[in-house]
Amino acid sequence: MNCWKTINLMKDYGAVRIILTAVCFMILVFISTFLAFELLRPGTSLSDEYVSLFGGLLVVILFVHKVIHVLPIICKKRKIEKKFYILRMRTWKRIPKTTMLISLVSPFLLITPVLFYAALAFPNHAHYFCMISGIHAGYCLPDFLLALKLIKAPKTAFIDQEADGLDILVEK
């Protein structure tokens, strides 16, 4: 296996740019989801109860995000390294490109619709679900940036996570 390319988001974009883009993306997603909710349920009165539940749900969503990342890899029955750090897991060893792409975008595609449905189901607390959805979307931004870079890789490539980023491996 040869290394086709190494992806390091901090080196490519910089931490400040990623954070600023993530915050802008959070605000954009919050505004768009809240406006969509208001179009579907106009005139709903919002309640400011259960703020602590909002904080707890936010923490749970971030951990569920990490678990959903691992599910496509488990479905492929790949050997994964089980080092669970707080919100940081090093699990990627020789993962096929398509599996890695699915793993990167699946948290956003699974969690965001659930949060929007929860906003419709509990209209008095919709602003909480829209905020969590926005925060989660900002948390997904590095995954989207990695996915955009992986799309350009050869179809038969494998992904290996190293300490400084991801390596895209191709066979000779």
UniProtKB/Swiss-Prot annotation:
Pfam families in the record, alphabetically? DUF3267 (PF11667)
Residues in coiled coil = none
Record-annotated membrane-spanning stretches? 18-38, 54-74, 102-122, 128-148
Name it: Uncharacterized membrane protein YhaJ
The residue range of the signal peptide is none
Which organism was this protein described from? Answer: Bacillus subtilis (strain 168)
For this UniProt record, the keywords arranged alphabetically read as follows: Cell membrane, Membrane, Transmembrane, Transmembrane helix
**Major place of localization?**
membrane
Gene Ontology CC entries for this record: plasma membrane
What membrane topology does the annotation report for this chain? Multi-pass membrane protein
Localization recorded for this chain is: Cell membrane
